[in-house]
């Protein structure tokens, strides 16, 4: 545990396996079959409950088929909750170019503040590709009523903690019955997940 550069250096040069708690660049994917009411509550909790923790939402991925029905009310709810929202061009067009555009660096940034990047994706596979490219293997979640789609997400996302219809902030040792934690191990070898 420590700064990003310290953790990476220790992991790179250690002669023994070390447990690393690195960044928590957490994602939520809103599927076209998501329940809007639940999605708004989950997303606001995931971003705004405690913005500076490693389990806070940093990137929101929304299926392109539900941008108007789900994306617009979710983004408006985030903004009214005090969150700064950065979006891709497709979403900004819906908002008549009134929101700030996300840059490439935003997809790989752990803000630890009331700020979130929002991107439209064409499918669960597109969401998984984005998470694979930019994620930190910490905590990622899908919001969907379609269990088949959720199963694809949960089986393919390479995260220490994968969730379905739950806030990424529900990712501490206490919630899993492990007691207090030192960090979330994103290593592929055990232990993985909350470590106390």
Regions found by a protein language model. Name each.
Residues 1-2:
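Active-site phosphate-binding strand-loop segment of PLP-dependent enzymes
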Residues 5-6, 73, 126, 149:
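Short Gly/charged-rich anion-binding patches and loops
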Residues 7-113, 164:
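ALDH superfamily catalytic-core signature
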Residues 103-196:
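Conserved C-terminal structural/oligomerization subdomain of aldehyde/semialdehyde dehydrogenase
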């Amino acid at each position: 545990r420590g700064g990003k550069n310290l953790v990476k250096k220790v992991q790179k040069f250690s002669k023994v396996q070390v447990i690393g708690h690195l960044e928590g660049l957490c994602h939520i994917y809103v599927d076209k079959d998501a329940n809007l009411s639940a999605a708004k509550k989950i997303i606001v909790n995931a971003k705004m409950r405690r913005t500076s923790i490693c389990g806070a939402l940093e990137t929101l991925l929304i299926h392109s088929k539900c941008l108007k029905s789900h994306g617009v009310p979710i983004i408006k709810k985030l903004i009214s909750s005090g969150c700064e929202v950065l979006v891709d061009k497709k979403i900004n067009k819906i908002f008549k170019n009134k929101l700030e555009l996300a840059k490439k660096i935003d997809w790989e940034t752990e803000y630890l503040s009331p700020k979130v990047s929002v991107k439209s994706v064409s499918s669960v596979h597109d969401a998984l590709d984005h998470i694979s490219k930019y994620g930190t293997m910490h905590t990622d979640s899908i919001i969907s009523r379609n269990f088949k789609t959720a199963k694809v997400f949960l089986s393919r996302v390479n995260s220490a903690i994968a969730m379905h219809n739950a806030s990424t902030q529900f990712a501490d040792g206490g919630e899993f019955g492990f007691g207090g934690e030192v960090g979330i191990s994103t290593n592929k070898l055990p232990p993985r997940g909350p470590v106390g």
